[in-house]
Amino acid sequence: IKKILPLVEKINSLNLELENISDEEIIQKSEQFRSVIVKRVESARKDALENLSDIDQQKKQILLAEHEALEEILPDAFALAKEVCKRLCGSSWSVVGRETKWEMIPYDVQIIGGIILHRGNVAEMKTGEGKTLVAVFPIYLNALAGRGVHLITVNDYLAQRDAEWMGEVYKRLGLSVGYILNSMHPDQRRSNYL
């Protein structure tokens, strides 16, 4: 965790610079992040196809380029997600049929958890420590790659709750959100997977 603290400090510093940008500029920043990833991946794909004959090696090179782009964007993307959380404070919306007021500004420990998850590690957290909010950061970052992100929960209630609750953050960042329930028709499930 000590190795991650300088990155958290950078994220918090970048977040302060975002206080005066418009909501439209937030969406534009998300698009810029996507563009960086697409360019990096396309360049790696072209290079891999020209220089590598092994398909597995080509895929590795392309995924490595995507991973490197995501790591490069991580501080700015996490800062942007934190800014959206701050802006939502005081807002209310319906979550599983109940009006819910947003009052969450991510703590450093939640940002640390997001970094740990993004890097493919397990982050153990106790009840009430903000696991749902922690997931916002790596979900947003990895969704920028355009391949979709799936979060698995233990039951239908949590799937719907978390999609509706955190969905406002994702939407303000320019993402779409869907969720799957056991009772859904296959066509509806299919459209939500996209």
Walk through the language-model features, giving the residues of each.
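Hydrophobic/aromatic ligand-binding patch that stacks against planar heteroaromatic rings
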Residues: 114-116, 141-142, 169, 192
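Conserved pre-motif I regulatory segment
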Residues: 1-129, 133-140
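Short, exposed beta-strand "edge-strand" segments with a Pro/Gly-rich flavor and a Y/T-containing core
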Residues: 14-21, 151, 179-184
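Solvent-exposed, charged/polar functional surfaces in cytosolic regulatory/catalytic domains
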Residues: 80, 84, 165, 172
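Conserved motor-coupling elements within RecA-like helicase/translocase cores
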Residues: 167-194
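Short functional linear motifs
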Residues: 23-26, 163, 189
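Conserved SF1/SF2 helicase motif Ia
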Residues: 119-129, 134-164, 172-173, 180
